[in-house]
Amino acid sequence: ELHSQLLKDVTLKNFSDVYPDKFTNVTNGVTPRRFVKLANPRLSDLITEGLGTDKWVSDLELLKGLEPLAADDEFVKKFAAVKQANKVDFSNYAKREYGFDIDPNTMINTMVKRLHEYKRQALKILAVIARYADIKSGRIAADDVMPRTIVFGAKAAPGYYLAKQTIQLINNVARVINNDPDVKGKLNVYFPWNYNVRLAQHLIPATDLDEQISQAGKEASGTGNMKFALNGAMTVGTLDGANVEIRERVGAENFFLFGMTVDEVDALYAEGYDPKKYYEADPRLKAAIDMVADGTFSNGDKTVYEDLVHDWLTKDWFMTLADFGAYTAIQSEIEALYAQPLEWNRKALINVANSGYFSSDRSMEDYLERIWMTGPLK
């Protein structure tokens, strides 16, 4: 809906003014057969138990019937047990396929999507570096850190240099952090290669927190956020793409919102965005970028990430630095809720119950009725 409105108001405004009735919108959807029934059999069985029917597989709006069960502590505990079992399964899968030692008792925090500057994997990895620096400097005692496992998955276009640099940086940060005894058991980073549907079917059901942190106004819709919400992950995100509709349906109190709006982004562009101002004003952001620049993650070679750092400090077209403060601030809210497992899982269950709208079946019905002006075959 957000991007359809942007097309009407900005990109295709002249056409929209003349032919307003020719513009409509169909929100994406995902298939519950693959991404819940097949990928997450434990959750599927629990949903069927809670609803008393398996008809939800072909009528996903029936998930709404789970919402009253969020008040039932025993059902919420069953829901939490499903998530924990899925995390154990993913840990075993990651060890077998990649050699990763993932602790299923940590928060599994996932960011999987195409590698592009507007999707802002750089924002996530800079926040990880800042947390690492906090622990190393003693700013935060290791014992006070909530254990977190960060999982990235991405591919970049072959000629997209800055995206390739970002992938290399994430892997090098993972290498340093995962081998540092000072943060052992508190912070780990993994980048499984060749992200694909097979891996997704193991990772998505195991995820506690999903990252949807693109710059507001740049993501057309997205379907990853729908898959994660349907599988009981909480979302941290901006008001962009389908995040807007997910937040409306699951409730603002069940979504971790941060960052600038589209209007605020446009206003900052108009006044002249200077990323270096944010670098100089935020000691944690400065420390993180300086660690990238000084060779901490490139075996002491300061030239490896010169281009990436230069882009952050002089261009930063998608305002990673401007949203860094808001993004790191929301982490304390996330961790406070995660420290209350019953309440976290209650909200995660509410996400599942209110995500039925995001079925590909509903998308197809919308296309049939509003675009193609036809109906299903009898």
Predicted regions and their residues:
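Short, solvent-exposed loop/turn segments at secondary-structure junctions
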Residues: 2-4, 30-33, 117, 155-158, ...
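Short alpha-helical segments and helix-capping/turn motifs at coil-helix boundaries
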Residues: 5-13, 128-134, 220, 241-242
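Long, K/E/R/D-enriched contiguous segments that form extended
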Residues: 84-201, 373
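Glycine- and acidic
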Residues: 64-79, 99-117, 147-163, 184-193, ...
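Catalytic binding pocket for nucleotide-activated donors in carbohydrate/polymer assembly enzymes
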Residues: 14, 19, 27-65, 205-206, ...
